[in-house]
Each structure stands twice: as structure tokens, then as C-alpha cells.
């Protein structure tokens, strides 16, 4: 995939030199990526040119680098609740050091056969993993404040612990949508969504008869509290 947008979820990438290659998003907002799987890339799972990724539930397997920052470009990266396996060169390759825009945060990242967690391209420094299997409770590189009254300084915070067991797969952070053939469109049931018509009765009847109700974009006017039964879902897409 070339040049991502601002949000990506529930996707899988197999093979290729890279799973994702991307430059800055438009209009320069961060990129949120949730519930992704990468396997067998020849160079890196993700190659970023100043994107500013925020990543949750990223499973990477059998590739030299999980995340690579483009040469001579500072970048921001936050990775949380992820699993990296068989990463031969480095979990993260940091391109630029000592730059205010270089920010790296890893939180609760499980690693299996990842001998180098972070490699710094400029200095050649490497942060080694603690064992064959380990958990990164916290890793931070960038400007760090001890408290609000102190000046910031470039620091590296590393809290890694060896573990005896790691998960084989990751569960999903986002709920799985019900099958689309089970959806009922609230507009087909008579809702207007024009900001003026009172759609309360349509919604009340819909939730009493259906479990999965799709609500297209609009301004739906409700004048009473809508009470949902257990398992009833209102589905909106952006």
C-alpha cells in the first residue's frame, strides 16, 4: 500500500518489499492504524516518511524490520499492544537522532526472536532484546520532561522484561461488524435525518424489531431517550 490516509483497520499484508510505504498524510494529521498483520516482507513491514504513525495491535512476522523511518527524516511513532516475531535486523529503525521531531514510544510490545529492538542509523547504536522472548513494557526515545518545571532533554527510557510465554496471536481491539446482510437501513424504515423531522418513533420501532441498524450520515432528531436491548447495534460509517 502506498500513501495511507488518516485511519486504517483490520487489514493484512503478505510479502512484497514493504507492506506499507507512506509519506505525510493530508493535512499532516497523525495516522492511526489498528488490528493489522504483516508477514514476509523482504525489507520492512512499514516504511515511513514523516507520517507520524500511532499503532495498536500490530502483528509482524518474518521480516527484517517491523518499522523503518526513512533516511534523514525525523518521524514520530507510537506502538502499543503489539506482537513482533522473527524480526532479523531491528524492530524499529530510527533515522534521525537529537531532533525534536524524533519521537518513539513502545508500550506493551511482545517480542519473539527480535534480537535488536531499536537500531539508530546515525550513531549505529543498538538496543538489544533481553532474551529470546521478552516484553517491552515501555520504551521511549525523544525529548523527555522530568516534570513541568524542568527543561526537557533527549533521553532513552527502556523497561524490558524476559518472559516465559507469549501470545501466539493478537485479539482485535475493535469490535467485529455484524454481517452486512443482517443490517437494516434506518432510512428504509422511514427516518429522514434532515435535522427537522422527529425521527424518535422510527428509531424506537427499529430497535424493538431489529438487532443491526445502519444509520447513514444525517441529522437525526430524537426527542426521547432511546433504549437499546442487549445485543442491539447502531452502525455508523464515516
Question: Across the structure, where does each feature detected by a protein language model lie?
Answer:
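Extracellular "leader-to-stem" segments immediately downstream of a signal peptide or signal-anchor
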Residues: 1, 6-10, 14-15, 22-40, ...
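N-terminal extracellular ligand-recognition/capping segment immediately after the signal peptide
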Residues: 200-238
